[in-house]
Amino acid sequence: MRSLSLLWRYPVITLTVLAFALVGVLHAVDQQQVGRWIATVYVAAVVVWTLIGMVRDVLRGHVGLDILAVVAMVATLAVGEYIAALIIVLMLSGGEALEDFAGRRARRDLSALLDRSPRIAHVLHDPGDAQSDEAHDVPVDEVAVGDVLLVRPAEIVPVDGTLLTTEGEFDESSLTGESLPVSRHAGEEVLSGAINGSRAIRLRALRTGADSQYQQIVALVNQAESSHAPIVRLADRFAIPFTAVALVLAGTAWALSGDATRFAEVLVLATPCPLLIAAPVAFLGGLSRAAKSGVIMKSGAVVEQIARVRSAAFDKTGTLTQGRPELVDVRPAPGFDADEVLQLAASAEQYSSHVLAAGIRTAAEARGLPLEAAAEASETATNGVSATIRGRTVVVGKPAYVASLAPDTVRAELGTGEAAAYVAVDGRFAGALLLADAARPEAAAVVSWLRLHEVERVAMLTGDVRSTAESVAHQLGIEEVHAELLPPEKVRLAAELEPRPVLMVGDGVNDAPVLAAADIGIAMGAKGATAAGDAADVVILVDSLAKVVDAVAIGRHTLRVALTSIWIGIGLSVGLMVVAMTGLIPAVAGALVQELVDLATILYALRALSGPPSGLRPGADGTGADAVPAVAATPAPGR
């Protein structure tokens, strides 16, 4: 059955092999003339069909590379080399089969992502019954936010959700490229597409199927697979010169020898399979390699653009920095202990939605300080929170808000990039908690790597205040800073940056316009910044800036492989054509040799799958040294 499907998949190969067999039988029974006519009619039909395809390509704006194959088939028929003509047909159709095989191999990782897309979810009938696993199956698209789902061992998590089970272990390799299992605890988010471990778990749906992480990845992969624009453009650049060289060599051989057969013998070695097949295979391999590394490039055009990048611009908050405040110091007032101040503040901040509150709670948990429940709590928007804990009134917030309730409040001296939350207990100032948005530990290494790898200009484009932006930029090695920008100003600056192409990296909704305006927009998509991801050309699925290095390195490796495979094919073809001009390579032998050239270039193009080494070594600064550059701190948004 498989053999029959292959015959139907490649009908031209099947018909050509049958034509070969029939011509061979006719030769055996001394009917060479009939065999000649059958071969001639068959090849002529293929020529007509190929010409129709060429016209369609030209109408779509692409150069018809098959012109050399058509001329070669016509020339071999004209001089009576009908066996060579059949071999050329077999070579072209075989080249398409090789392209199909190599393309399937190259897009294997992309296809794996699509094939693993979750389709069914188990919705629990009675979520309140911890002992009951009775559930009904629904399509993933029908899961509603808040549904409690059962995920059995080794099943794929269908939608993004909050883990309700005490602990679970998940394989997130399809999302992040991390091969080791990852442990998640109750209350933590589990992304769709992760594979559950050896025990059943429960989770509450945070997002619908369409909005979940894996389904967004699938949409991006579909978009990447459907794009072939750069491959065609890359081949078109070589098509006309290669065609001209081949025709000149063939015409010269005919003119010097006076033998029209020599024209056909040269053109047989000029078929353009390295251009038609090797380059597309290399680009597909690059897209697949990137996807496996947690980087989705939306089209092949991006692979070529990112390979040639000469300028890079970065947003600050959430891109160069971690985008979340971390506690850097506790300054207790006289009579208060640092841990006591932090514990009371964190307990009160359980009832606040402010960004600083999360950093304070995280710091308390990291120090092993239990959060206590409040008898009552209220939050004053943009100012702070008040809670009654163990009979004590705890107030946390802005200095003016806390001072209105505790007149002895003392403002803390803040360093560049620091923000403070002030704490009062029972009307007395208890201390200040200093927080900062720390730079990503890999940010300096990424900037250094780009500078060392032919990126001539690195800039920061941010809406943050200049003093903070310049402090971060200085510590990360970025010399050009544009601060206090509105989105339209970011777009204008991205359009003006030279040299080009320009790469822009951002993560937030306000970055979407500038990501769309840049030559290559890269979105840090791990946190679900949908608008930025939609506008970007590249989406990084892992919360790591080091993946920018992966994207550039894979793009350059892929383009290098594509160009090298093209030049290998062209070099071998031109060399063989020069030899054929002397009459040393008959048409039939030339057609067979050219098939080997095609195979060699395709095998070389598959090197794009291996790719360069991924990521920056921990602690690397881009120069091979072990030290990590100093970490900058930037202010978290104030209350």
What is the predicted role of each segment?
Residues 1-15:
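N-terminal membrane topogenic signal
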Residues 114-211, 301-345, 386-389, 478, ...:
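Conserved cytosolic catalytic loops of P-type ATPases
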Residues 2, 23-24, 34-120, 124, ...:
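Actuator/coupling domain of P-type ATPases
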Residues 2-6, 25-26, 51-59, 71-79, ...:
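Membrane-embedded alpha-helical bundles of multi-pass transporters
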Residues 55-59, 98-111, 281-300, 606-621:
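Juxtamembrane helix-loop transition segments at the membrane interface in multi-pass membrane proteins
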Residues 17-18, 233-271, 280, 563-590:
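Bilayer-spanning, highly hydrophobic alpha-helical transmembrane segments
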Residues 112-113, 300-520, 553-556, 608-609, ...:
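Cytosolic catalytic headpiece
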Residues 40-44, 93, 241, 262-280, ...:
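Small-residue-enriched core segments of transmembrane alpha-helices in multipass membrane transport
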